[in-house]
Amino acid sequence: MNNYLLKCENINKFYQEGENQTQVLKGVSFSMEPAELVAIVGSSGSGKSTLLHTLGGLDQPSSGEVFINGQSLQKASANELAALRNRYLGFVYQFHHLMADFTALENVMMPMLIGHQNKTEAKDRAEKMLSAVGLSHRITHRPSALSGGERQRVAIARALVNNPSLVLADEPTGNLDHKTTESIFELIQQLNQEQNIAFLLVTHDMGLAEKLSRRLVMQDGLLKEGA
C-alpha cells in the first residue's frame, strides 16, 4: 500500500433524486506512484470531476476506499482528513477561485495562514511559488489586473504553497486559449520534473492528455487505462 501515493479500491458513487438513483462511479480502482503525471479524459458527465473530488476527500464514495500515502480517507476523522489534505494535496480548478480583494501574494499565502503557519514564512514561501510560476513581477496585483493565464498561474502557486505531494487539477486549462494552455502545461511539466510533484489532471483536451506519460479514460462511470 505504501508504495503508492494515491490508491483507490472499488469506488462506487450513487446520487439519489427522489425515487431515482443514478450511479456516477462504478467500481473504480487505480493507483498513482510518487511524481507521476496522469490524465483522466472523458466526455462531460462521465464522472471525471466526481472521481477527482472523491480522491481529494471533498466528497465521500457510497462504497470503496481511497488511500493517500497509505492512509485511508474513509477511516479518518474530520480533523485527520483536513490534515491529510493539507499535508499531501493541492487543488486547481477550471475557475481560479481567487479572492478578488486580495493580491496575488495574499491569495497564495492564504492556505498557509489558514493552517496557522507563521506569516513571515508564509510570505516567503508564497513569493517563492509565484516566482516558480513566472509571476514574481505581479505579486502585488489583484486578480482583476491579471490575465486569465496569470490568474491560473496564481491558482497553481496557491496549490503548491504547502508543498503537496500530489496536485489534483480539474480542467485547469478549460477556460484558456491554446497558447496559454500550452504555457500552463509546460509549467506543470516543469514543476513535476523539478519538484517531483505528482499531478492528476482531469481534462477533455485529448491533445493535452496525449502529452502525459499515462492516460486513463472515464466513460459512463467506468475507468480504464488509455492507449
Curated annotation (Swiss-Prot):
A single GO molecular function term of this UniProt record: ATP binding
InterPro entries referenced in this protein's UniProt entry, alphabetically: AAA+_ATPase, ABC_transporter-like_ATP-bd, ABC_transporter-like_CS, ABC_transpr_LolD-like, LolD_lipo_ATP-bd, MacB-like_ATP-bd, P-loop_NTPase
Protein name: Lipoprotein-releasing system ATP-binding protein LolD
The EC number(s) this enzyme carries: 7.6.2.-
Binding site for ATP: 42-49
General function of this protein: Part of the ABC transporter complex LolCDE involved in the translocation of mature outer membrane-directed lipoproteins, from the inner membrane to the periplasmic chaperone, LolA. Responsible for the formation of the LolA-lipoprotein complex in an ATP-dependent manner.
Top-level EC class as recorded in UniProt: translocase
Keywords per UniProt: ATP-binding, Cell inner membrane, Cell membrane, Membrane, Nucleotide-binding, Translocase, Transport
Gene name of the record: lolD
SMART domains attached to this UniProt entry: AAA
Assembly with partners or alone: The complex is composed of two ATP-binding proteins (LolD) and two transmembrane proteins (LolC and LolE).
Localization per record: Cell inner membrane
GO biological process, one term: transmembrane transport
Any Gene Ontology CC annotation: plasma membrane
Cysteine pairings via disulfide bonds: none
Membrane-protein topology: Peripheral membrane protein
Pfam families: ABC_tran
